[in-house]
């Protein structure tokens, strides 16, 4: 975003907030500014606030709330002491039931505005655990010389800075309550300036921390990590380089996995693998997707962007055959191992870059009844344009970005003869503005 070069006038102003933006900020049009839009962090629709400008650009301004003069009835006191500074979650001031209402509204607005489509039915919002749900994430680590301390946390609203966290209530408690201990541990290390980030991931029986370090750890620092792991019940992995450089420090064998009891499936994973962040919502989402797909015992299903087999293996318990395709060869290898470990011989997996031409791929010509896809934020348009879509009776699309879903929905409905039967939001990331959603398409 191009910002003006003039010195920013930070004089607070009073304004009425009319809407909530897709990223969770209040929207106002300032009098005396020609109706120019201002996005205000910490403000809610229907409120009268005092706001301090933080940035100006040609088309809109940005500000932060410094006082609430007339509060929305939906405003609540944020649980977290770092709300308003940390960017980890920006909706804690909005009553929980209204957060998902706002996300449904963002989804429908995107479908209509970008895709020019409207679902025949709006699915009830899917919700799971609201606190202590985040089982995977990345903390930034920074040694701040001016403060003479090490900070561990998520980025601040101003992403140049790392939030100095004392606790995080959205992260699983075993990690969220130990952030100050992590910061103190690193502060006492020889290589405290050489650790830029810590990744965390939790299975059902183990929690792992992966330490990215730019220089080899001293023996003293290695032992400090081992002692910390033993005292607090963590597995520690070291990452001196890229993803392939990750190796266990302690213990040497770590049983990282999660179970899906409804499907009698267990999925093993590695410390940097992608898994769904919210365990309780993930189980509901899988059941939701399988039901919406109307999967039947004689069906052959194609599962694109399948990862470890999060949807593929439960589907294998229901249908005749399922084929999973994923761009990450490591995840495909783990998916195959998971299928074998769970005794599922009707699940096949292929590694393929789904943004590239796959029309000659063997899996493309196998013939399927139904399609399930769970693409990254960029969506699935490249592969949708290659698929023999006329062969699919039904498509279930799980999305982590409403904009790309809307674009792809427009393609399916307006160009390929599908009906958008239903769509709805799923609250994978409570208290954040992130919108996870699911949509169902049927051939007309």
Swiss-Prot record:
Top EC category: transferase
EC number: 2.1.1.190
Biological process (GO), any one: rRNA base methylation
Residues of the TRAM domain: 5-67
Chain ranges passing through the membrane: none
Catalytic activity entry: uridine(1939) in 23S rRNA + S-adenosyl-L-methionine = 5-methyluridine(1939) in 23S rRNA + S-adenosyl-L-homocysteine + H(+)
InterPro entries recorded: 23S_rRNA_MeTrfase_RlmD, MeTrfase_TrmA_AS, MeTrfase_TrmA_CS, NA-bd_OB-fold, SAM-dependent_MTases_sf, TRAM_dom, U5_MeTrfase_fam
Region forming the signal peptide: none
UniProt-annotated binding residues for [4Fe-4S] cluster: 80, 86, 89, 168
Positions of the catalytic residues: 400 (nucleophile)
Pfam families in UniProt: tRNA_U5-meth_tr
Keywords, alphabetical: 4Fe-4S, Iron, Iron-sulfur, Metal-binding, Methyltransferase, rRNA processing, S-adenosyl-L-methionine, Transferase
Record-linked CDD domains: AdoMet_MTases
Function: Catalyzes the formation of 5-methyl-uridine at position 1939 (m5U1939) in 23S rRNA.
Family of the protein in this entry: Belongs to the class I-like SAM-binding methyltransferase superfamily. RNA M5U methyltransferase family. RlmD subfamily.
UniProt-recorded name of the protein: 23S rRNA (uracil(1939)-C(5))-methyltransferase RlmD
Organism: Xanthomonas axonopodis pv. citri (strain 306)
Gene transcribed to yield this protein: rlmD
